[in-house]
From Swiss-Prot:
The keyword Disulfide bond applies. Transmembrane segments: none annotated. Belongs to the frog skin active peptide (FSAP) family. Ranatuerin subfamily. The lineage of its organism: Eukaryota, Metazoa, Chordata, Craniata, Vertebrata. GO terms for biological process: defense response to bacterium. Antibacterial activity against Gram-positive bacterium S.aureus (MIC=55 uM). Shows no detectable hemolytic activity towards human erythrocytes. Expressed by the skin glands. It is found in: Secreted. One of its GO terms (cellular component) is extracellular region. Disulfide bonds join 18-24. Its main location: secreted. This is Ranatuerin-4. Keywords: Amphibian defense peptide, Antibiotic, Antimicrobial, Disulfide bond, Secreted.
Length: 24
């Protein structure tokens, strides 16, 4: 369960940061 969340966060957070800061 926890590795799944870590893997999901690793995918989601960069795209959130990308869309917020416009730095991809």
């Amino acid at each position: 369960f926890l590795p799944f969340i870590a893997r999901l966060a690793a995918k989601v957070f960069p795209s959130i940061i990308c869309s917020v800061t416009k730095k991809c």
